[in-house]
């Protein structure tokens, strides 16, 4: 099985599930090759590392084994305008850092601890599927291009997916499987297509409208 993978990452639980689904392919006894033509970073690499073989284009972005969270805080702004936000929880750490309330040092430390624990799980996952990889060396959140990624054992070879597939076509029968996103309600009703048609028609008529407007301009005379 060959999987073309392109992802810069996202939520941990979503990519953990996606990686588990790829692992099922291997559990079924099938050889899994992941091809990275553009990017497989963070959660994307979490998915890629499951493969028996990882191929990357020379300038594909690979790595970013780390965890990041950004939380804006409006407490000072709200306090300036005499606005209080009440947060009610059951359980000491049900809510650590918050957007509207005041974040204490204990809250921040707990949140940082959770990030570190998630990072450890990420590293352990990569280590499980890439035992020859020096995980501590590459689990800094940095990313590398394919040329450098191969020297760090993040990938196994430099090759584009097209090149690899064409190579396999010489002695194998290939079947392309494409997923289709569930259509939205607007697409089902044809609303989105109608809107696109209106926009396209308006764009087509724009040059004529501008020409008429230009010809209708009256010369200006200074008194």
Task: Map each language-model feature to its residues.
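Short glycine/proline-centered loop/turn elements that form peptide/ligand docking sites
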Residues: 61
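N-terminal organellar transit peptides
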Residues: 1-47, 51-57, 65-223
């Amino acid at each position: 099985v060959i999987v073309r993978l392109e992802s810069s990452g996202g939520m941990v639980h979503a990519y953990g599930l996606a990686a588990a689904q790829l692992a099922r392919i291997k559990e079924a006894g099938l050889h899994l090759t992941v091809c990275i033509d553009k990017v497989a970073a963070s959660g994307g690499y979490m998915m890629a590392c499951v493969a028996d073989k990882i191929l990357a284009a020379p300038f594909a972005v690979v790595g970013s084994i780390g965890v990041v969270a950004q939380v804006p805080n409006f407490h000072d702004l709200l306090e300036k305008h005499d606005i209080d936000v009440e947060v009610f929880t059951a359980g000491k750490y049900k809510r650590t850092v918050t957007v509207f309330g005041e974040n204490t040092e204990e809250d921040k430390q707990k949140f940082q601890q959770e990030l570190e624990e998630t990072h450890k799980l990420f590293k352990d996952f990569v280590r499980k599927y890439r035992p020859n990889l020096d995980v501590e060396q590459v689990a800094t959140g940095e990313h590398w291009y394919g040329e450098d990624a191969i020297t760090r054992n993040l990938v196994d070879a430099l090759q584009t997916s097209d090149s690899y597939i064409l190579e396999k076509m010489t002695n194998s029968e290939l079947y392309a499987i494409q997923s289709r996103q569930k259509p939205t309600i607007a697409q089902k009703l044809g609303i989105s297509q109608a809107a696109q048609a209106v926009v396209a028609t308006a764009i087509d008529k724009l040059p004529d409208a501008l020409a008429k407007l230009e010809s209708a301009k009256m010369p200006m005379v200074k008194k």
